[in-house]
Design a protein with these regions (language model features):
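ABC transporter nucleotide-binding domains
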Residues: 1-167
Length: 167
């Protein structure tokens, strides 16, 4: 349940994402979208295929530079140009979760290495034991047991794969 007096965790105001196809033609993929998400709140972005849902997500996490609008995350304006350090910090706090988990999970890697990849990139551990401990804690957060770290993606049910993707 979201707190009534809390500031929004994510605030999107007047988001526009246009793609120039040619000199005379521009696709308005997202045009003037605004919403707020509060701590503890679950938010569903629903629309038909091609309506811009994924484009909104990619703009928010800065895979695309928005054409216009303001995006505030945890009280910080992330709309304009971000430094490399700001981008790295943002990437540790936001992620895309794909609808088809098998498309986003490397079938040749164990779950420990799939989850550990983010820890490796951001240098979030000092020893292999600390890495393993962090992976197990992340698995616990999504309702999976420590022994799941030794499995490959094909050894999970669809729901479990989705949780690995979230982890």
């Amino acid at each position: 349940m979201a707190e009534q007096n809390a500031a929004p965790l994510l605030k999107v105001e007047g988001l526009k994402q246009y793609f120039r196809v040619s000199k005379s033609y521009t696709v308005k993929a997202v045009d003037n979208v605004s919403f707020e998400i509060y701590p503890g709140e679950t938010y569903g972005l629903v629309g038909e295929s091609g309506s811009g849902k994924s484009t909104i997500g990619r703009s928010i996490i800065r895979l695309y530079d928005p054409t216009a609008g303001k995006i505030t995350f945890d009280g910080q304006d992330i709309s304009g140009r971000l430094t490399h350090a700001q981008n790295n910090t943002l990437r540790t706090q936001m992620q895309m979760i794909f609808q088809d988990p098998m498309a986003s999970l490397n079938p040749r890697k164990k779950v420990e290495d799939i989850i550990g990849e983010g820890l490796d990139i951001h240098h979030m551990y000092k020893t292999k034991e600390e890495r393993r401990d962090k992976v197990e804690k992340i698995l616990a957060k999504v309702g999976l047991a420590p022994e799941h770290a030794e499995r490959y993606p094909h050894q999970f049910s669809g729901g479990q794969r989705q949780r690995v993707g979230i982890a």
